[in-house]
Amino acid sequence: MKIAVYGKGGIGKSTTSCNTSIASARRGKRVLQIGCDPKHDSTFTLTGSLIPTIIDTSQSKDYHYEDVWPEDVIYKGYGGVDCVEVGGPPAGAGCGGYVVGETVKLLKELNAFYEYDIILFDVSGDVVCGGFVVLLNYADYCIIITDNGFDALFAVNCIAASVREKARTHSLRLAGSVGNRTSKRDLINRYVEACPMPVLEVSLLIEDIRVSRVKGKTSFEMVEFQPFLNYVCEFYLNIADQILSQPEGVIPKEIPDRELFSLLSDFYLNPTNNERENKNQETLLDFMII
């Protein structure tokens, strides 16, 4: 199973990817995480360092790919997760998306692409150019990371459009969205009502999640020394369980930009209406509990 993780830049894709990779490994799966960002820091919390990239290795071999072996580009990370970093060309030169495509070709030539139960692509930012979106050609599922904010949900909508387009010719489905480090989910709820998609999980605004990234450790590694953080790991185990169940997924129908702008901006411009809706929902829940 191949999963592509997208989302707005800085939204927490790498944090979510690393922890979900470990959660999948904890379920007995063999996992490969491929960092598809020129910053090459996707697997930092898995390996504890910035591992050499495909670009670095290729340069050291004078671009003789026949001299590249799996152990030259695949590094063992925490929890038994294997890691690859694609890297990218210098800033302002070349196409990072092209390098990603070449990485997939190289892994296929090394017979490494088909040896895993789960391959997770952690993709750069919210880009929708053909170079990075080409990863959707290889994916069975896409997961979009968001928060309860205006900009992040705009990115979700743009990525949803890319998924719909690729699903025309590939057996690709949107597994769902993941809310990351957000104290509320009311704006997420409003969006998924207008553009139906599953919400796999919403992690709370937990400082320990941010700190784990700074420390270069996953939540699963931190819990070995801070057992009270075990509840954080449950978020990622839940995501992994849903993915491993091979969900039906959806082909999303994105919202036209102007309609989306009105939908999301109205949420901020008319807070009274939103509070009334929330109270109605709470009242309904009270009756349901009774």
Curated annotation (Swiss-Prot):
It is found in: Plastid, Chloroplast. InterPro entries: NifH/chlL_CS, NifH/frxC, P-loop_NTPase, Protochlorophyllide_ATP-bd. Its EC number is 1.3.7.7. It catalyses: chlorophyllide a + oxidized 2[4Fe-4S]-[ferredoxin] + 2 ADP + 2 phosphate = protochlorophyllide a + reduced 2[4Fe-4S]-[ferredoxin] + 2 ATP + 2 H2O. One of its GO terms (cellular component) is chloroplast. GO terms for molecular function: 4 iron, 4 sulfur cluster binding; ATP binding; metal ion binding; oxidoreductase activity, acting on iron-sulfur proteins as donors; oxidoreductase activity, acting on the CH-CH group of donors, iron-sulfur protein as acceptor. Binds 1 [4Fe-4S] cluster per dimer. Its cofactor is [4Fe-4S] cluster. One of its GO terms (biological process) is photosynthesis, dark reaction. Mg(2+) binds at S14. Pathway: Porphyrin-containing compound metabolism; chlorophyll biosynthesis (light-independent). ATP binds at G10, I11, G12, K13, S14, T15, K39, N180, R181. It is an enzyme of class 1 (oxidoreductase). Keywords: 4Fe-4S, ATP-binding, Chlorophyll biosynthesis, Chloroplast, Iron, Iron-sulfur, Magnesium, Metal-binding, Nucleotide-binding, Oxidoreductase, Photosynthesis, Plastid. [4Fe-4S] cluster binds at C95, C129. Belongs to the NifH/BchL/ChlL family. Homodimer. Protochlorophyllide reductase is composed of three subunits; ChlL, ChlN and ChlB. HAMAP family: ChlL_BchL. Component of the dark-operative protochlorophyllide reductase (DPOR) that uses Mg-ATP and reduced ferredoxin to reduce ring D of protochlorophyllide (Pchlide) to form chlorophyllide a (Chlide). This reaction is light-independent. The L component serves as a unique electron donor to the NB-component of the complex, and binds Mg-ATP. NCBIfam families: DPOR_bchL (TIGR01281). This is Light-independent protochlorophyllide reductase iron-sulfur ATP-binding protein. It comes from Anthoceros angustus.
